[in-house]
């Protein structure tokens, strides 16, 4: 009987389908693949953004007015490589490809998927819109309604919306009567599979990779935390003050001020009674003295349109 040597291609053919089965977040967002090789970790590639058009009322007298097709790009740093490393001796006990699949490929694919899901879910730190109460697990239909309202206000396209919930929120939702009794509209999936399904225009999924955010310790000894001094519109540096202000702000902390929501983009600490933090999106004009609200530690469940995020990959040279 001829010897059979397992090659890298055979591993890939077996592992990739199993990896895709375990992926959650990347399968719900925009994906950018290319055959162009990346030479090394940290390379920057340009990813095309969808073309945006503006519609107008047709005027027969003016005739057709063509719109320019402008393709814009965004730079993405390929700064993450997920890997599962196993010594050759650990694979030598396998006597067939089926053994290799059971002992190594399937567990490795699951581990890689968990790593990729967790890295993707860390993007919550860049999301500034938020609803609900920090530290309180969403457990009513109002959570869906408020998330839908936030997406509508941001003019997110209606089709393709999705939501990822942590196990606690998922358990609370699957016990809701309107979801349990969804069989009245022809579906028994919620009852038999424990699946939330599509609610209020969003496809809902559970993921153990949903992140828990630990907020910074910024606090004032008494009174409110307020904006310190005037700020011009368009800036990203927000200065806060308060009575005997102490503590820190962490990347991903949520700040509400002047009717807007912002996320902290870099860690910051109090110095000389004030704290200067970088935020997104750009600030409006502030006169100073505006009251600031800080969200506490919370679970970062996500509701989004697929075009809000992108999963970008490139092959590495052998």
Segments predicted by a language model, with ranges:
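N-terminal "assembly arms/tails" that initiate or stabilize quaternary assembly
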Residues: 1-74, 78
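Surface-exposed ligand/attachment interfaces on beta-rich extracellular proteins
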Residues: 31-36, 133-142, 146, 231, ...
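Long, contiguous amphipathic alpha-helices that act as assembly "spine/axial" helices in icosahedral shell
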Residues: 47, 74-143, 152-168, 195-204
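Conserved "cap/hinge" positions at secondary-structure junctions
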Residues: 49, 258-259, 296
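Short helix/loop capping segments that flank catalytic or ligand/cofactor-binding pockets
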Residues: 55-58, 86, 96, 172-175, ...
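Signature of extracytoplasmic/envelope-associated structural regions
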Residues: 107-136, 217-224, 243, 301, ...
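Autoprocessing Asn-cyclization modules and mimics
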Residues: 172, 177-287
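Glycine- and charge-enriched low-complexity intrinsically disordered segments
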Residues: 274-318
């Amino acid at each position: 009987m001829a010897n059979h040597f397992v090659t890298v291609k055979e591993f890939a053919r077996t592992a990739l389908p199993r990896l895709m089965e375990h992926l959650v977040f990347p399968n719900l967002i925009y994906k950018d693949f290319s055959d162009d090789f990346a030479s090394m970790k940290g390379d920057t590639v340009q990813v095309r953004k969808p073309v945006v058009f503006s519609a107008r009322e047709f005027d027969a007298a003016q005739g057709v007015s063509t719109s320019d097709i402008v393709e814009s790009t965004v730079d993405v740093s390929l700064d993450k490589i997920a890997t599962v490393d196993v010594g050759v001796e650990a694979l030598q006990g396998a006597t067939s490809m089926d053994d290799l699949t059971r002992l190594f490929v399937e567990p490795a694919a699951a581990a890689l998927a968990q790593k990729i899901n967790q890295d993707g879910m860390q993007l919550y730190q860049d999301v500034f819109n938020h609803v609900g109460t920090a530290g309180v697990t969403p457990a009513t239909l109002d959570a869906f309604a408020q998330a839908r309202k936030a997406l509508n206000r941001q003019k997110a396209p209606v089709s393709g919306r999705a939501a990822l919930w942590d196990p606690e929120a998922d358990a609370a939702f699957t016990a809701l009567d309107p979801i349990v009794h969804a069989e009245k509209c022809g579906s028994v999936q919620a009852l038999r599979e424990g699946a939330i399904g599509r609610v209020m225009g969003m496809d809902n999924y559970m993921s153990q990779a949903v992140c828990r955010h630990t907020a910074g310790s910024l606090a004032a000894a008494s009174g409110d935390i307020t904006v310190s001094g005037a700020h011009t519109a368009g800036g990203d540096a927000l200065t806060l003050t308060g009575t005997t202000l102490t503590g820190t702000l962490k990347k991903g902390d949520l700040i509400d001020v002047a009717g807007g929501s912002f996320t902290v983009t870099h860690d910051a600490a109090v110095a000389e009674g004030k704290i200067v933090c970088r935020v997104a999106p750009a600030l409006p004009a502030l006169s100073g003295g505006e009251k600031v609200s800080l969200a506490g530690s919370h679970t970062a469940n996500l509701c989004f349109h697929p075009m809000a995020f992108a999963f970008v990959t490139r092959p590495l040279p052998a």
